Amino acid sequence: PRVNMCRLAAYLGPEIPLRSFLLDFPHSLYQQSWDPKELTEARLNADGYGVAWRQRDGRMGAYAQPMAIWNDVNLPALADALTSTSWLGNVRSATPGQPVHAINTQPFAVDRVAMTHNGYLSGLAQGGRGRILSNLSDVVQSQLNGTTDSEYLFALLRQARLDGAPDLATALAAALRIATQCTAGQAALLNVCVSDGEQLVFSRHAVERPCPSLYLNRSPAG
């Protein structure tokens, strides 16, 4: 079956407005939504978009719309009004059969952690979803709102943190390990970025498929 994929971007550094992160960078996420490069399993990312950012109180905020990014009439005003030192962004190409809805639109954020995922987990409908749920506490299960593989991966990450993972990298590694075990080693693309507003942690991983590209750029402060 055809499985579509999202595009993601992340930023950590001096405070910048949302416009700089989402719209103004060369080949920005906005441009990638309709003019992608190196996109292997979709043509457009028009099924929603979202951003997450570190708020003044240290918690991660999120904004998501289940529409193409270029159709959001609120974006120009938000792009100038919101500023942060940490951003995550995602433009979505929904897997066929997955509802296009705000609750299924990344990034996902709970309290002081946010996550965005480019890729997919196969096998959820073949028992993988139930096996993932069996690894989640009642508290984490109660916070599930949508139906996507990405949100279930985020739930596993939060569970790993509740179970005592000492840092984000350890929690992400645990989430990826359990997710691939629960889906019995079926095909998966697992480019993931996690943020607590003070650090970014990435994975570039795949099962039975080539990894999607993932680029890192470091610039001097300021």
Task: For the regions a language model picked out, list residue spans one by one.
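Conserved catalytic micro-motifs used in adenylation/nucleotidyl-transfer and phosphoryl/amide-
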Residues: 6, 51, 105-121, 177-222
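A short, polar/proline- and glycine-enriched secondary-structure boundary/capping micro-motif
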Residues: 72-75, 134, 211-218
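Short acidic (Asp/Glu) patches
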Residues: 33-36, 66-78, 89-111, 135-138
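Short helix/loop capping segments that flank catalytic or ligand/cofactor-binding pockets
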Residues: 19-20, 61-62, 97-99, 124-126, ...
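Extreme N-terminus nucleophile/cap motif
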Residues: 2-67
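Structured interaction and signal-relay segments at domain junctions
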Residues: 48-85, 89-91, 204-208
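Short histidine
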Residues: 122-196
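Short, basic and Ser/Thr-rich N-terminal targeting/leader segments
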Residues: 2-4, 45-49, 82-84, 89, ...
